[in-house]
Every structure is written in C-alpha cells, then in structure tokens.
Swiss-Prot record:
Pfam families: AAA_33 (PF13671), SAP (PF02037), SPRY (PF00622). Binds to MLF1 and retains it in the nucleus. This is Heterogeneous nuclear ribonucleoprotein U-like protein 2. InterPro entries: B30.2/SPRY, B30.2/SPRY_sf, ConA-like_dom_sf, P-loop_NTPase, SAP_dom, SAP_dom_sf, SPRY_dom, SPRY_hnRNP_U. It is found in: Nucleus. The modification Phosphothreonine is found at residue 163. The keyword Membrane does not apply. Its main location: nucleus.
Length: 745
C-alpha cells in the first residue's frame, strides 16, 4: 500500500478500520497510517500476528515525503486537491450506511406488502450525492468526469454499487462532530475540513416524481470531465445457429445469460431487488406437441432486512411482445406464487414453486385450440391456457422465462436426460426439425451496424410517444426504448391484487428506476442492438457523455419542441396519468440549461420531431430567458484548494509576498517595524519555523513539533542569506521569488 497515493477518504477509511483517529490534515492522516503499517510489519516479522491500535502507536514515527518539493510539485499538489474536492462532494455517499444497517436502527414497522417494506428499508439510508447536486442553482452542464465503471458508476462516478468501509452510526456521529470542529479551526490553512461538502435540505414534498429523479441523475453526472472508458466488446464465438438457446438479442439488458446460453440470472438483484428480467429462446414453434423444462437452481442472497421474494415466471410468448411475460397480448406465464398470467390478468393456478423445483411447459397445437399446460416436478398441473388458432394466426410461440432474485436453468432438449420424463408424444423443442421451427431475428454482425437515437426535450413534450411510435413503425430495427417508464414497468409487482403503494415507497421506486436507467445506458453501449434513449437530455454535457459511450454506433438526435399551448396541455395530461408534477425549481433549471443541439463529431444527425429548428429556437430562447430571471443567482463552489499556495502565486505575480498587499523589501522600514517587531531594525526575514509555529499554535491550539516537520520545509533563513549575497543588485528578482525561490545548495 502506497500511503502517499491514497486520497483523504481512503486514508480515513484505513485508519477507521484499524481503530485509529481519522481526523486532521491529509499530512497527519498519511503519517498516522504509515506508522500503523510499520508497526504491523514489525510485528509480522517478529511473529506476532495482528497489530492492534496500541501496537501501531508504539511504532517509530516515519516521516512522509512532502509532495511538491520540485518545480512541478505545486501543480501535482493542485491536481491532488482537485481530486479531493470531488471526493469531499461524494463523501456523503462513501459514508452512507447500507440499507440493512439503516433498517436495523429504525423501529420495526407493522407488517406491510413485501414490495413496500423493502423499499422503505432502502429509503432509511442517507441521501445520495446526486440529491445534493440537483438542488444547486449552478448546474449548467459543464464538462464531465469519469462517472465510473464504475456510473454508477459512481458518478458517477464509480460504477460500483456499494462503497466499502461503512462505519457504526455512533462512531460516525462522533467523527462528523470532530471534523466540523477541525474544519472551523483550520479554515485559514485551507484544510480538508474546509473542502467538506454540505448537503442541501430535502424538499418539503415527499414525492418528487420521475422528472425530478431524472434531473438528479443528469445533474449528478454533469460534474464528469470525460465519459467513462467503454469496456472492450467480448468477441463472439462461432455458434451453431441451429441450436435452441436463449436469445441475447431480444433479452433484457439486465438479464445475465450464462455462457452456454441455457440459463441466467438478474444482473442487479442486490441493488434493485424489485427488478424483473428475462429472455426468450432463439426458436419458436407453430405445430406439434412441444415442451421444455425450467429449474430454479438457486435463490440469490439479498441484503439483510430486504423482504423481496425470489420468483420465477415461465411460459410462452410470441415475438415482439414485451419482455414482461404474461403482461402483454399473446404472452402466457406460470408464476411461482401459484398464479397464471395472460395480458396482465392474473388468476390462481396449480401450486406455488421455488428453489430446486422443475417446471415443465407444454404446448399442444394438435387440438382445436392451442393448449398450454404445466407440470411441477413431473406432476401434471393441467391446462392453463387455451388459445384460438384464428387469433394466434401464424405467430410462433417461443419459450420465455422471467425471474426476480433467482437463477434459472433451462432444458430445451440439449441434456442427455431430462429432469423429468415428458408425457407421451411430447418432444423437446430442440428435437423439432430446424425447418419446422421459426427463428427470431438475427442480431447485427458488427456494432457499427447499430444505431442509437437520443431524445431531447423538456418533460411532457412528447418524447416517449414519439419514441414508441417510431419503434412500432420500424419493427425490423427492433429498437430498445430505454426510459424511466420502461424500467418502472419492470419493477412493479403485479398479481391478483396489486398492493397500494404509499407516496414514500412510490417515490423510492421512481428514484431506483432512474438510477437503474443510468446503468442500463452504460450496458447498452456494449450491446449489438438499436436503442432509443428516452430521457430529457437537455444538458449539452449529458448529451455528449451519453453519445460518446456509443462511439461506434450511428448516433442520431431527435429534438421534440411543441408549441406552448400543446406543451401545457401535455403536462396536465402527464400529471393526471402519472400522478406527479415536475417541481418548479427543476423545470426552471431544465429551461435555463436547454439549448438546441448542433451536428458535431459525436452527433451524426440532428432532426426535429415536431417544430422545426427555425420555429423551435425562439421558444427555447424564451424559456431560457424566463427561467434565468426566476432562478436565484448560482452559488459558485468555493475554491477548496490550498489557499496559501494560491495566494502566494498571485502575490508573486505582483511583486508581493505572503502577507497583505504592501510592497516590501530591505528599504521598507515601516514594513520591518510593523511585522518584525522592533523599530529601526532593517527589514529582514525571520526564521521560517518560528513564523509557522505561531500560525500552527494559533489555529490548532497544540504544541508545534519541530522534529516532526523539519523534513517537510527548508531552512529559508539560510537560503535567503545565500540569495541576498549572490543577488544583492537584482532587487526586482528578489521580490518576485520570496516564496518561489528554491535556494542554492
């Protein structure tokens, strides 16, 4: 572990893990951690395992090399400070306790529906950093930084879902109180405490709505300086196109298909336990007696306190139906709760099933009506659906699975022995001759053949309607519409009686949908598909960040700007349907930052869905001017760098020194009398350590340790004497280099 390369939050995390004090300047934290590491190393060499906090304190102090010793040291220090600034803003996220821990602190609520309880447990955690940035008035879509592989990571952002090193609530409160006190004392020195981000208060309204959380995600990622580096695309191996397996082209993006493509599991089950995901097979059938098997091999572990259950829904569906099995026309599923589902209608059927159970799915096309039946562990459960052949027409039925928090394994007939023998005359779909099967669409051979369409427009402008209509009118392109409403559909629990969600749970579900959507966009950029990104995307920085992810795609932008009357009417309709309104502050922020995109290196084409550019530009300009008048002045972020270094650089350019704006030198008697004490003394430069000691004691109220800091600072008294004797005639140069001079050796 290289201590000097660690950032402030990482230093604090390592110290807390060892039970050591995590308050103070970065220099103190680094030395404290280095001493602990030295003590652990010495004890390991001596054969004593596990150095505790006491052993670390007994270790010999090891000085940490000061950064910025050379001519380029200041620049390197500034870069580190910039990174620490971002860390300070994200520090709330790093210290946020996991939902399970937060649930343990709260009182146990009365029994509620599973979905509501799980989401309320999640909401006990602290606010995300996106919430802190969304409320600020200065979000204007600047350049981006790596939102992480990491969006989500975070925003970024690291893309990892969890942050290590969570701490106990009591210790955290004590640490925060101590940090606040240290920051008050260390403000003049530009310490880390001064850079600590301050979270904004939550809005009084508990329920915010979809547009609010979409704006939060955009505002959070707008701090990014560059898009995250795209991961290398996995090379597709040559596959036998006659095999029946799960189709990676039509499956959900968040469904992780196994390597052999005969099974899979949800990708975000731990972060988003309410999210359903699934896939269809590559082949369907239109005649005969055909079957396949599905087994729940494992229920995925979930966070402590999460009340979500593991479920599998298995059955048949036609091509082009939605991925939610049983919730669309010509989509038929058998649910693990002992329910059958067709076109969104649920009825009781058969038995419940779960881990290690095998469900047999049978389609009989040889009767007057197509009969779909199921079995559990070899036991026949009877016919669940009867479908008119006239209504089904020539559509093929494809095996389809949909799961939540579980791992599923499928047998299409590729196994030597089935889990349970099928009824007589039924054959596995893999045994059906290839010419009698119906193949689904083949994915593009290369990612360069794929296309992404970025929707741009204010909330309620009609982007979603345009995207859905365009995808329906171009079925051969098989567009995947990525929007918050699509994700919400996959997160909702449906059944005999849909549980009524309270505003708090509904608000949390919308928040999770926006976060999940950000991760799906990153996954989409590595998939050989066509996409429509159905979000507001009013920030130029957000447009750039997303489109740069799809660098090998054909990238198009569709701007939807209706006239004012139509937009107001659509907003009212949206409010009636979705039950939420866009907060005024969020709408003003979007208007103020909305500008029409122009064709550039990451936008191959810009088109307009309603009003053309000549008509849309005056409306957008009007929105922008009105919003800027109503918005409060933007709060500029305070410069949390080392203020002393910055002030010195500014003063050196004016021929001034460390204190004040007075021009100084050996001829300035007033300056020498004022600063150095006794009148009549010729102006000189007192020992650097004496001056630093006074500042240190005044700000931190503790004794200055000379030996501790002697390796960090040079003896400027000796250096300045050398400088004076060698350059007495060059007064101007002398003034310019009061602090910048490196001395002669």
């Amino acid at each position: 572990m290289e201590v000097k390369r660690l950032k402030v939050t990482e230093l604090r995390s390592e110290l807390q893990r060892r039970g050591l004090d995590s308050r103070g300047l970065k220099m103190d934290l680094a030395q404290r951690l280095q001493e602990a590491l030295d003590a652990e190393m010495l004890e390991d060499e001596a054969g004593v395992g596990g150095a505790g906090p006491g052993g670390a304190c007994k270790a010999e102090p090891r000085p940490v090399a000061a950064s910025g010793g050379g001519p380029g040291g200041d620049e390197e220090e500034e870069d580190d400070d910039e990174e620490e600034d971002e860390e300070a803003l994200l520090e709330d996220e790093d210290e946020e306790p996991p939902p399970a821990q937060a649930l343990g602190q709260a009182a146990q609520p009365p029994p509620e529906p599973p979905e509501t309880s799980a989401m309320e447990a999640e909401s006990e955690a602290s606010d995300t950093p996106a919430e802190a940035t969304a409320g600020s008035g200065g979000v204007n879509g600047g350049e981006e930084h790596d939102n992480g592989k990491g969006e989500e990571d975070g925003p970024e952002e690291r893309s990892g879902d969890e942050t290590p090193g969570s701490e106990a609530p009591g210790d955290k409160a004590v640490e925060e109180q101590g940090d606040d006190q240290d920051s008050e004392k260390s403000k003049p020195a530009g310490s880390d405490g001064e850079r600590r981000g301050v979270k904004r208060q939550r809005d009084e309204k508990d329920e915010h709505g979809r547009a609010y959380y979409e704006f939060r995600e955009e505002a959070y990622h707008s701090r990014s300086k560059s898009p995250p580096p795209p991961e290398e695309e996995a090379k597709d191996e040559e596959e036998d196109q006659t095999l029946v397996n799960l189709d990676t082209y039509t499956s959900d993006l968040h469904f992780q298909i196994s390597k052999d493509r005969y099974g899979g599991q949800p990708l975000f089950s731990e972060k988003f336990p309410t999210l359903w995901s699934g896939a269809r097979s590559t082949y369907g059938v239109t005649k005969g007696k055909v079957c396949f098997e599905a087994k729940v091999t494992q229920n995925l572990p979930m966070k402590e306190g999460c009340t979500e259950v593991s479920l599998l829904r298995v059955g048949w569906s036609v091509d082009f139906s939605c991925s939610q099995l049983g919730e669309d026309e010509f989509s038929y599923g058998f649910d693990g709760r002992g329910l059958k589902a067709e076109n969104g209608q649920f009825e009781e059927f058969g038995q419940t099933f779960g881990e290690n159970d095998v469900i047999g799915c049978f389609a009989n096309f040889e009767t007057e009506e197509v009969e779909l039946s199921f079995s559990k562990n070899g036991e026949d459960l009877g016919v669940a659906f009867r479908i008119s052949k006239e209504s089904l027409a020539d559509r093929a039925l494809l095996p389809h699975v949909l799961c939540k928090n579980c791992v599923v394994e499928l047998n299409f007939g590729q196994k030597e022995e089935p889990f349970f023998p099928p009824p007589e005359e039924f054959v596995f779909i893999h045994a059906v001759p290839v010419e009698e099967r119906v193949r689904t669409a083949v994915p593009p051979k290369t990612i360069e053949e794929c296309e992404v369409i970025l929707m741009v427009g204010l909330p309620g402008s009609g982007k979603t309607q345009w995207a859905l209509k365009y995808a329906k009118d171009n079925p051969e392109r098989r567009y995947n519409v990525l929007g918050a409403e699509t994700v919400l559909t996959q997160m909702r629990m449906k059944g005999l009686e849909e549980p009524e969600m309270d505003p708090k749970s509904r608000d949390l579900l919308v928040q999770q949908a926006s976060q999940c959507l950000s991760k799906l966009v990153q996954i989409a950029s590595r998939s050989k598909r066509n996409f429509i990104l159905d979000q507001c995307n009013v920030y130029n920085s957000g447009q750039r960040r997303k489109l740069l992810l799809f660098k090998t795609f054909s990238r198009k932008v569709v701007v939807v700007v209706p006239n004012e009357e139509d937009w107001k009417r659509r907003l009212e309709l949206r409010k009636e349907v979705e039950g939420d309104d866009v907060p005024e502050s969020i709408m003003l922020e979007m208007k103020a930052n909305f500008s029409l995109p122009e064709k550039c290196d990451y936008m191959d084409e810009v088109t307009y869905g309603e009003l053309e550019k000549e008509e849309a530009q005056p409306i957008v300009t009007k929105y922008k001017e009105e919003a800027r008048k109503l918005l409060p002045p933007s709060e500029k972020r305070t410069n949390r760098r080392n203020n002393r270094n910055k002030r010195n650089r500014q003063n050196r350019s004016r021929g001034q020194g460390y204190v004040g704006g007075q021009r100084r030198g050996y001829d300035n008697r007033a300056y020498g009398q004022q600063y150095w004490g006794q009148s009549g003394n010729r102006g000189g430069y007192r020992n650097f350590y004496d001056r630093y000691r006074g500042d240190y004691e005044r700000f931190y109220s503790r004794d200055y340790e000379y030996n501790r800091y002697r390796d960090y600072y040079r003896q400027y008294n000796r250096d300045w004497q050398n400088y004076y004797y060698h350059h007495q005639q060059d007064r101007d140069r002398y003034y310019r280099n009061y602090y910048g001079y490196q001395g002669y050796r």
